[in-house]
A protein has these predicted regions:
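Phosphate/dinucleotide-binding and metal-coordinating scaffold of catalytic cores
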Residues: 1-216, 220-221, 234-290
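Conserved protein-kinase catalytic-loop segment immediately C-terminal to the catalytic Asp
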Residues: 227, 232-234
Length: 290
């Protein structure tokens, strides 16, 4: 049940309760069922007892979907205020507090994220992070572009990023990987993630290299939100194992995006983060290849 709930739009996302009421849905989970629980991050779905459906005919990787639900959930585009909205969309299975929707451009699926708070700085930060990865020569990252979107008469910057899963691969977050793993008392969560990843097909050096790179670049950018759902692995449905690290993604909560006063001097060592450690500076202890 927890896994299923985490695939849905969270109840705490701004505006979701009013949107559910408009759609005549009681919960985000029931909204997700309107699209059979289909997602663009994994291959799980619900087969109704009363219908005979086939994955090839309904999956969002190969089949088109309506923009209507995505427009409603992100306050973008035109919607039917009477609630006659097609809910057959992967927008119902995108979690996180920020408003998001999937769009199709030239047959490619893109995730669009919209945030009207903090002048839309998070979208700009994603682009800055991409330029950093590019300058450092790091290949395994998700490219982000900035797209201006009109909301309530205002132009707001949103981020647009291409799908990095496929018909053959699913995203397994670090949280999903270790949530049922009993971590020994003498092992850190950081080492536990590496250990479980290796047991499920990964090469240890590859995992360490990307985690250390991620920690270092997060430090440079002062990304404060590298929680365990913000990095992960790609799982092969055919090989039934992890095959590579997922590209670096979700770095928008960086560059003091929500600060009125930027820390200086010793204050920089006290920055709190949501990750392996409570303080940003302490994260560097995990970096061995310097």
């Amino acid at each position: 049940a927890q896994w299923w709930n985490m695939r849905a739009v969270p109840d705490t996302r701004k505006g979701i309760q009013q949107q559910l009421k408009l759609l005549g849905e009681e919960t985000s989970q029931s909204l997700m069922l309107a699209a059979y629980g289909l997602s663009l991050t994994d291959h799980y779905w619900m087969q109704p007892v009363s219908k005979e459906l086939y994955w090839k005919n309904i999956n969002f990787f190969e089949n088109e979907f309506s923009d209507e639900l995505g427009n409603l959930l992100t306050d973008t585009g035109k919607i039917d205020v009477e609630g006659h909205i097609s809910c057959f969309s992967p927008a119902s299975s995108v979690n996180g507090e920020m408003k998001k929707k999937w769009v199709i451009r030239d047959h490619t699926r893109f995730l669009m994220k919209i945030n009207t708070n903090n002048y839309g700085q998070q979208a700009v930060n994603e682009k800055i992070a991409c330029r950093l990865h590019e300058r450092l020569g790091w290949k395994n990252y998700v490219p982000y572009e900035i797209e201006m979107t009109r909301i309530d008469g205002l132009q707001v910057p949103g981020s647009l990023t291409p799908l990095f899963t496929s018909l053959d691969t699913e995203l397994v977050s670090a949280y999903q990987l270790i949530k049922d793993y009993k971590i020994p008392n003498d092992q850190s969560e950081y080492e536990a993630i590496i250990n479980v990843a290796v047991k499920n097909g990964m090469e240890e050096l590859e995992v360490r290299a990307q985690l250390e790179y991620m920690i270092l670049t997060d430090f440079v950018l002062s990304n404060t939100d590298r929680h365990y759902n913000n990095f992960g692995f790609l799982y092969s449905c055919e090989a039934h194992k992890l095959i590579k690290m997922a590209p670096v993604y979700d770095t928008g909560n960086c560059l003091f995006y929500d600060k009125d006063i930027i820390p200086v001097k010793s204050g920089l060592l006290e920055i709190r983060v949501n990750s392996f450690c409570k303080k940003e500076a302490d994260m560097l202890a995990y970096v061995k290849n310097r």
